Amino acid sequence: MFFQTGLLLSLSLWTKVAYAAFGITTSSSSYVIDAGSANPLKFTVSRSSCDITSINYSGTELQYASKGSHISSGLGRATVSATQDGDYIKVTCATSTLTHYMVVHHGDSTIHMATHITAEPSIGELRFIARLKSDVLPNEEPFGDVSTTAGGTAIEGSDVFLVNGKTRSKFYSSQRFIDDQRHCISGSAHRVCMILNQYESSSGGPFHRDIDANNGGGFNALYWYMNSGHVQTEPYRMGLHGPYSMVFSRSGMPGTNIDTSFFANLNIKGYVPASGRGTVTGKASGADSRMKWVVHWHNTAAQYWTYTASDGSFTSPAMKPGTYTMVYYQGEYKVAETSVTVRAGSKITKNISGSVKTGKTIFKIGEWDGQPTGFRNADKQLRMHPSDSRMAAWGPLTYTVGRSAPSDFPMAVFKSVNNPVTIKFTASAAQTAAATLRIGTTLSFAGGRPQAKINSYTAAAPPAPKNLDSRGVTRGAYRGLGEVYDVAIPAGTIVAGVNTITISVVSGNSGEKFLSPNFVFDCVELFQ
């Protein structure tokens, strides 16, 4: 009995000691941070480079041994310090243009981070990459092995691979920022998730997407891309990026509603607390009610967004003070734009209204939603290369109005693959007057844009769109600047009876197969 009592007392004391382990252990080369959590989290940070060189969670080493976890491709040299303030530990890594923070709260198996920049990193992108052991954490969530490239053969550049007959790429792990609050990698006994609650200093807007994960063999990479040149549509933002949180768990999926308001008390450069922010409330109206509506605010310093409720009402996230462009989308298609000024501590009311305006429709292929939804291969393009054997034949295709399905129309036209796309339609005598053919696109590559021919009339080629200088469709992207082209059709060009329209890719550039000039369709509408 005495032995059992003593054993229980010893275990109780041991447990208290284990929880009391919260703190910093300093050596000449590193800081070891112990979170003091029930499932123990202990990680090591290099004092010279800011690399995380070890992550031990619940008794298992998760960090890839040959290369650390870090900002960008590593800072190289940095001034690194670690301080403890009550229940919080803060690691600060500083260079002349970048300050990276790692924060641990006593008892939580989470590394909270934020990154402040005054200039873009020399590699041309700002990201955090956790390189974790692929034998312990082999799985990628939520999209599975579409981004597992281990054992593959490169088929495009150094980032698209063929693995067991299927195309894979790290780019196929992406999801839209507005929907990406959490992405993870996992194994049989561990899960590590990146929780993203603050995109205000990132670039690209609510529908931008970037790499989330990539199991390349030796390590499984878990990313948070704050900005990059991957189909980037706007300038990079400086200032504080984050907070963002790397959460460690056993089998459970962590929630996405993480409170990081304690950053306000930690002397984080550029952090704006709730008291220094304001909100915008209002009601959106007029757009197609079959689609989700999004309201988006942006200026050169920050960006925010929210879905509206079913009645169009909305409240913005807490925003930094400033004047913002305010945009209203049906799906991803812009239907209205205005401006609003936000002040600290205030709640501004601002309604917004808009709709798609065309004319009397003769035919419409697709919907004005800013996406290639429903078109051929649009259901697969996010997660595989257009050359993949699982793709339906690209054509060239002919779409007959009134008979063909949306899947008979290609999501994209490639100059060297399926050029042109043909549309056949029957017009009445009343429809032979002057008309407009509106061709909506979502993304252009290598200067690709549409040139239309209506029966014997060939419309002028439009000027080249802005060059985003980034592969798109082949890396799972469909959204760029969303150019819309109007073709004025003279009276008498359309005839009573059967008519033929061809839409071709024109560009002064060239390329092979799916890297030839191309564009992605949103919608095609003929109206008077």
UniProtKB/Swiss-Prot annotation:
Cellular compartments annotated: Secreted
Gene Ontology cellular-component terms listed: extracellular region
InterPro entries assigned to the protein according to its UniProt record, in alphabetical order: Carb-bd-like_fold (IPR013784), Gal_mutarotase_sf_dom (IPR011013), Galactose-bd-like_sf (IPR008979), GH-type_carb-bd (IPR014718), RG-lyase_II (IPR029413), RG-lyase_III (IPR029411), Rhamnogalacturonase_B (IPR016590), RhgB_N (IPR015364)
EC number assigned by the record: 4.2.2.23
Disulphide bridges: 50-93, 184-193
The reaction(s) this protein catalyses: Endotype eliminative cleavage of L-alpha-rhamnopyranosyl-(1->4)-alpha-D-galactopyranosyluronic acid bonds of rhamnogalacturonan I domains in ramified hairy regions of pectin leaving L-rhamnopyranose at the reducing end and 4-deoxy-4,5-unsaturated D-galactopyranosyluronic acid at the non-reducing end
Residues glycosylated per entry: 56, 351
GO-annotated biological processes: cell wall organization; pectin catabolic process
A Pfam family annotated for this UniProt entry: RhgB_N
Purpose: Pectinolytic enzymes consist of four classes of enzymes: pectin lyase, polygalacturonase, pectin methylesterase and rhamnogalacturonase. Degrades the rhamnogalacturonan I (RG-I) backbone of pectin. Active against linseed rhamnogalacturonan.
Protein name: Probable rhamnogalacturonate lyase A
Native species: Aspergillus clavatus (strain ATCC 1007 / CBS 513.65 / DSM 816 / NCTC 3887 / NRRL 1 / QM 1276 / 107)
Underlying gene: rglA
